[in-house]
Structure formats: C-alpha cells, structure tokens
Amino acid sequence: MSLKNGEQNDLSPKDSVKGNDQYRSPSGIHVEHEEESRNDFWQFESSNLFRHPRIHLEPQEKSDNNLKKFVIKKLEKSCQCSSTKAKNTIFGFLPVLQWLPKYDLKKNILGDMMSGLIVGILLVPQSIAYSLLAGQEPIYGLYTSFFASLIYFILGTSRHISVGIFGILCLMIGEVVDRELYIAGYDTVHAASNESSLVNQMSNQTCDRSCYAITVGSTVTFVAGVYQVAMGFFQVGFVSVYLSDALLGGFVTGASFTILTSQVKYLLGLSLPRSGGVGSLITTWIHIFRNIHKTNICDLITSLLCLLVLLPTKELNERFKSKLKAPIPVELFVVVAATLASHFGKLSEKYGTSIAGHIPTGFMPPKAPDWNLIPRVAVDAIAIAIIGFAITVSLSEMFAKKHGYTVKANQEMYAIGFCNIIPSFFHSFTTSAALAKTLVKESTGCQTQVSGVMTALVLLLVLLVIAPLFFSLQKSVLGVITIVNLRGALCKFKDLPQMWRISRMDTVIWFVTMLSSALISTEIGLLTGVCFSMFCVILRTQKPKASLLGLVEDSEVFESMSAYKNLQAKSGIKIFRFVAPLYYVNKEYFKSVLYKKTLNPVLVKAAQRKAAKKKIKRETVTLSGIQDEVSVQLSYDPLEFHTIVIDCSAIQFLDTAGIHTLKEVRRDYEAIGIQVLLAQCNPSVRDSLARGEYCKKDEENLLFYSVYEAMTFAEDSQNQKERYVPNGPSFSSD
C-alpha cells in the first residue's frame, strides 16, 4: 500500500500478525485512518509553525430576507403621500417639466431647429413610403411620425434619439394587417379606391378595407404600448438583455430581406397578394417570377432612375458627413421631381402606374381600438413591443453615454409605450427609435428634445397644407425609398469577417437569426434567435475552459499553465481553475476534467483495493508455511501530490448539484489521502456552501481567501504531517 510519507516499509511476520485484523476489515482501516488524518489536519492548522497566518474576515450582518416584511415595507413606502413625493412623481413621469425651464435658448435653439427641420424633411417621404410597408394609406404614416415626435418630447429622457416610423416594425404590423384583412374577407390584391376609402372615413360612413386596415394597425399598436408601459411599471426591462447585438443585427438584416422582397412588386408595377406566414419571402419571389411578364415598363424605368439618383447621393452623404453641415435631402427632391413628372406627364392615365392617390388634409376624429380584435393580435404585439423598446432603450443609452448624460431606462419604456398608446386613438401605428434618423439628428446639431417639436411642426405643415400635392406620386418611388434605406442593414455582411475573428459564437447567432427571420418569418426568427442565443450561453458553460495553474516567479499570482510559459508548479500540490458557474449542466464535465488533469480517485481507490486483496492473500500463505521468519513488503507507488486547490474565482454561483459535486469530489480524494481546498470563493458561493453544509463547524478552514494562502497552508500542513507520522506504516486506503 501507498504510505503517506512516500516511503516503503518492510514488515516482519511478527509485525504482520499484528496487522492481520486490519486486513480482515479494510473498511475499518479507512475510517480509522480518515478520522486520524482529519484530527491531525486541524491540529496542524491550529499550530504556530505555519509560515503565513490565515486570513480571517468578519462577514457583514445580513439583511432580513423575509418576503412578507419586504412587501409590506415596499407598500408602505409607495402609499406614503406628501407634497414633495407628489411633485417628484409628476416631474419623474414628465421629464419635460425638469429640463425645459432650464433650457438655454441662445446655446441650443439653433442646433435644435436645424436638426428638427432636416429630420422632418426626411420623415415626410419615409413616412409615406413606410405606410405601404405597414399596409396603410400614406396619411397614417404622417400621423404616426407627428404624434410620436410630440409625445416623446414630453416623456422622453434622451436628447438625441429620433422616435417615429421604423421599417422593421412596419413590416411586422403589415403582416398582422394582411392576415386580419384576409380573415375578414377583404381583397388582398386590389384595394378600393384611395379617394373613396378616405372620404368614407372622414364622413364616418361604413368601414371599408382601408378603414379596417388602420383599425387592425391601431389595435396592435395599442396592445404593444400597453405591454411596454407594463414592462416599465413592473421594471422588467431586463428582458432586453436577452437581445444581444448579434441577435438584433441578424434579426434586422433578415427582416430587411423581407422588406426588400415586399417592395419589389411596387418597383415592377405588379399587383400581387402580400404573402404572410411561414416562408413568405420565398412565396413572394415565386409570385414575382410567375408574373414578371406583367411588369409595368413605366414603373420599372421610374424605379431605375430613382435608384440611380438615390444610391450615389446617399453614399456621398455618408462619406462626406463630416464636411457637410447637413445631409442632402435627396429623398425629398426625388419625391417632388417624381410627383411633378407623374402629374404633368399623366403617367397614371397613360401607362396605368400605381399612385399614392388622395391624401386628405387635417386630422380624422379620434377612434378607439377595436376591443374585439385584441385577443387575436395580443400574441403578435409581444414581439413588436419587445423589439420596439429594446431598440429605443439601446439607442438612448448609446447616445447618452457618447454625450455624457444619463437616461432612465424605465422612463424610456414609459415614453415609447405612450408613443404607441395615445396615437393608437388617432389612426396611427407602432413607432420606435430609428438609428439612421438619430444619426442625422445628432450630426446636424441636435442639443435637446426641442428638436422633436420642430420635426412635428414640419409634419404638421405637410398634414394641413402640402399632403394633397402628393396625389400623383408613384408607389414605385416610395418602394425605392424604402429599399435604399435598407442599405445599412444589408451592408452588415461586410462586418462578418471581423465578427468571426472576435467571436465565432456571435457570428453563428447572427446567421441563425438572420436566416430564420428571412426564410421563416420575422416573429419566428426573433424567437429562434432568442432561443438559440440562450442555448449558446448554456453551451458555453456546459464545457467551459479549465486548467491547472502555476505560480508566476517572485509573486503570489497564479495563471494557467496551458496559456503561459515559465510558470512554477508546486511539488505535491495541484491548483485547478474552472471558468464557469458550477451547476447541473456542467457538473459531470467538472468532475471529468478535474480527474483528467489530476488523477481519478475512484480508479486509484479500486486499484488499491485490488492490490490489498492480493497482498493479504500472499501474506496468509507465507505465514502458514514452514519458514519461521519471512520479510513481506507491502507497498504502493506513492501519489504525486497530496493536495488539490480549486480556484473558485471564476465560479459565479453554485446550485444544489454543484454543491453535491464538490462534496463528492472532496470525499473521493480524501479516501486516497488527498485533501481538497477551495480558494477565492465569492460571498455568494460561500453562502451556498454554508447552506449546503459543505463544511462542518470545525472545517471552515477548508475555504481560503486566496490561492497563495491555500498553497502555503497545504505546504505547511504537509511538512508538519511528516513530522508527526509514526514509524509504522500508514496506509492511504483500505
């Protein structure tokens, strides 16, 4: 058998006879030896011969975690009423009351007016174009952008983001609208006359296709807004953390392919049903190629001319944005030129091109959402609400950090929620912040939320005076504007090589989300991306990195021996680091990698038992022979080490399975005479170990505050054990 001091001893027959009882009860040896070893361990620990004193920290008194008391305390605090609290509540809910009285007119007004004017000019054609994407009439896009700009001015905390119409949300709204129109029995190919549709609504007559479409859109918007306000109220904004940058990037790119596909029919002048549901992108392209011979040549030529103007000018704006005081509003110029050409050339009458039609001036009477539709659209609104607030909060925090101020994420959720709830009563659909317009707003001198008021005034001018002038505007022009604005999302492919070098896992998440969003559907794509992203997190912790550590020369620092050279491995001590939480998913991997890098105590124990049986049998035969005195040598090869130190600095938490695994590992190693020490456990892990009874009251010294302390303790205790070891053999197992 292996001796604790690594030596071999010869036993005479006389000595062997004394030990026969122990051999007949191997388990008795183990219990007796383990108890003796443990007593020696604590005796050594309490002696004064250690080179370094142990670190002892006094824990803070823990707060009372009684749920009932916590809830009562919160309710008492919430129900207290005073003039100061009422004032703070009002000012917190309406941030405009805080910052507007302090507004520096001379310093900020010029930049706010300039940025608001330019964003308003850009929003006019985009609002009209994105209305088609949402399955609505052009006027509703203008309503949406107008109300969102005003409400965010009152409730928002970000000085720079532009809240209004957003392509991805318009696509998601449009899919719901088309589905409900189909269920209601409306023709999904040919809409009723634009003029008659809107006249009926203005005069409160029977609701036709256009009326029902905006009813569905407003209802979805209302429900999404309620979700967002509820998220703010219950402070569940943490949901957005599951939408990583890679996931959002893949989702936006995948949805952009769907948007592009939905606009191709306008570029070609085709009257096609809008495909929805699973595989809509493929279905739409099949319909396009089947009807390609019906292409309207006038619409095709108009689309190509607009592309030739818009794409180069957009690139110039991007390349020379640092030199331009304001971006060239090329979209507005294209819309004006195309409208004039269509009107005076009578393109609709001569060539049958599809035009925007009558856009009324003024505002329609408020109308409540259709409460009967809410159960049918409630699930659709969840994804819309999450995407809307995730993009808004992330953009507001990004620009706040860039310009050195803070935003309140909860208030941002309230703001975007009410930007959807209130306008839903005024024939509007879902809004959120948009990166492209926010960048324009920032680059043109925006200083505060006053910029949003200027944007709203531009849109109000269009709504009251200019809107009817867009009657002859071709829908192909609006389709081109929508597609050109997707170039940022579609150009993300050029960033993939760099993303692959930085994180292959993020790149895979991006591709999975992009492909599922494009080829299946936007909602399923988002859900697939979230599920796959969470699976990747679990996968990363299922088989994390684990390594043996060595000591950096002339220091108390330990690092991975597989990552760095010239590290010193301490004789007789193995230091093991596991870089992940230890829980039910990776508990088996933890044991397997620890056993692989040190030794498997179960196999060693089995080998010792087998060897013990063979030597007992041999001894019995020898003693019963004719010889009076025979020397029998019982020995094992000594183990390479006596202590394992587990560096727990990277273990964020333990669950029940993790605690049980540590107990099992410790028990298995102690059975062969190897002590297990834990080092650098954070307070959470220490609490878990205490609750799981990993250490008994007299075993708290198994936990160390640093790896160096644990290593020193192991060396000193082993040195003292060798002094106390008796002359006779000391077996490490039964």
UniProtKB/Swiss-Prot annotation:
Transmembrane segments: 113-133, 138-158, 222-242, 247-267, 269-289, 292-312, 379-399, 415-435, 453-473, 519-539
PROSITE patterns found in the cross-reference section: SLC26A, STAS
PTM entry text: N-glycosylated.
Domain STAS: 563-714
Annotated GO CC locations: apical plasma membrane; plasma membrane
Region span, Disordered: 1-38
Catalysed reaction equations from the record: oxalate(in) + sulfate(out) = oxalate(out) + sulfate(in); sulfate(out) + 2 chloride(in) = sulfate(in) + 2 chloride(out); oxalate(out) + 2 chloride(in) = oxalate(in) + 2 chloride(out); bromide(in) + chloride(out) = bromide(out) + chloride(in)
Topology term for the membrane: Multi-pass membrane protein
Gene Ontology biological process terms from the UniProt entry: chondrocyte differentiation; chondrocyte proliferation; sulfate transmembrane transport
InterPro entries the UniProt entry points to: S04_transporter_CS, SLC26A/SulP_dom, SLC26A/SulP_fam, STAS_dom, STAS_dom_sf
Subcellular location, record wording: Cell membrane; Apical cell membrane
Glycosylation sites: N194, N204
Entry-linked Gene3D superfamilies: STAS domain
Keywords, comma-separated and alphabetical: Cell membrane, Glycoprotein, Membrane, Phosphoprotein, Transmembrane, Transmembrane helix, Transport
Positions with biased composition (Polar residues): 1-11
GO MF term list: secondary active sulfate transmembrane transporter activity; solute:inorganic anion antiporter activity; sulfate transmembrane transporter activity
Phosphoserine modification, residue list: S12, S16
Its job: Sulfate transporter which mediates sulfate uptake into chondrocytes in order to maintain adequate sulfation of proteoglycans which is needed for cartilage development. Mediates electroneutral anion exchange of sulfate ions for oxalate ions, sulfate and oxalate ions for chloride and/or hydroxyl ions and chloride ions for bromide, iodide and nitrate ions.
Annotated family: Belongs to the SLC26A/SulP transporter (TC 2.A.53) family.
Protein name from the UniProt record: Sulfate transporter
Lineage of origin: Eukaryota, Metazoa, Chordata, Craniata, Vertebrata
